């Protein structure tokens, strides 16, 4: 007597969904491992969503680092490469505007990492979620921001493009 297993369409679909979820969890874990560590800024530019005009918000020689930790914490610091330390109030204000620094717990969702900001150079970012899209090209990590309001042009949106190399 031969025992045959009957597989209903519902059972087959449930198994397929479970298998897909397992591969998704495995892929997220692999991606998480690839992201972990310290990354040094190679390049950054911002592009206007409508006009496609590009500019360097941190100047021609920005400096920066990001870090993804195994405790799911993300750190970021980017500064413009200024000619000298600021000495007067106007220079200090300009220095503040030419940097970005924040940290928080991050999670991966496919090609996005989302950081729940708990400390930032700009208090307006605290308790927000910062969404970034990411991909690897060779040994380099490419991060693209979601569109954000252009602080210099009312009604305009910018997207940031950043390239990092492992430290």
PLM region spans:
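Bacterial N-terminal signal peptides that target proteins for export
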Residues: 1-15
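Low-complexity, intrinsically disordered segments with a bias for serine/threonine
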Residues: 18-19
């Amino acid at each position: 007597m031969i025992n045959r297993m009957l597989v209903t369409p519902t059972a087959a679909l449930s198994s397929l969904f479970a298998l897909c979820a397992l591969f998704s969890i495995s892929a997220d874990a692999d991606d998480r491992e690839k992201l972990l560590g310290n990354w040094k800024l190679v390049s950054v530019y911002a592009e206007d969503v409508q006009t496609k005009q590009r500019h360097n918000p941190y100047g021609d020689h920005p400096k920066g680092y990001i870090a993804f930790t195994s405790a799911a914490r993300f750190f970021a610091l980017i500064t413009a490469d200024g000619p000298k330390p600021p000495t007067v109030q106007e220079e200090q204000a300009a220095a503040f505007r030419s940097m970005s620094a924040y940290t928080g717990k991050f999670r991966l969702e496919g090609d996005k990492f989302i950081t729940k900001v708990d400390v930032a150079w700009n208090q307006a970012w605290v308790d927000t979620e910062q969404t970034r899209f990411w991909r690897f090209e060779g040994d380099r990590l490419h991060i693209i921001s979601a569109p954000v309001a252009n602080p210099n042009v009312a009604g305009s949106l910018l997207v940031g493009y950043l390239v990092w190399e492992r430290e």
